[in-house]
């Protein structure tokens, strides 16, 4: 049986938390801020947590993180 390999594209985007979840940078933050409200820009500052539905699926893809 071959070794499980980590998906490298996903590994660059997600970090595993101590509780077993995954966090990533927010989308929609690279350009075109003039079309976004102050509230939107403020809320996009932090990192986003992956929802629990996707954590099981990504746990296999990112098994070695």
UniProtKB/Swiss-Prot annotation:
Entry keyword annotation includes Ligase: no
Gene Ontology terms describing biological process: translation
PROSITE patterns attached to this UniProt entry: RIBOSOMAL_L35
Record-stated family: Belongs to the bacterial ribosomal protein bL35 family.
Keyword Ribosomal protein carried by entry: yes
Protein name: Large ribosomal subunit protein bL35
HAMAP family: Ribosomal_bL35
Keywords of the record: Ribonucleoprotein, Ribosomal protein
Superkingdom per UniProt: Bacteria
Region (Disordered): 1-26
GO MF annotation: an example: structural constituent of ribosome
Organism: Oenococcus oeni (strain ATCC BAA-331 / PSU-1)
């Amino acid at each position: 049986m071959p070794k499980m390999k980590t998906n490298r594209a996903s590994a660059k985007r997600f970090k595993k938390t101590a509780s077993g979840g995954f966090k990533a940078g927010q989308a929609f933050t690279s350009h075109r801020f003039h079309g976004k409200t102050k509230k939107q820009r403020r809320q996009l500052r932090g990192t986003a947590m992956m929802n629990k539905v996707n954590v099981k699926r990504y746990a296999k893809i990112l098994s070695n993180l």
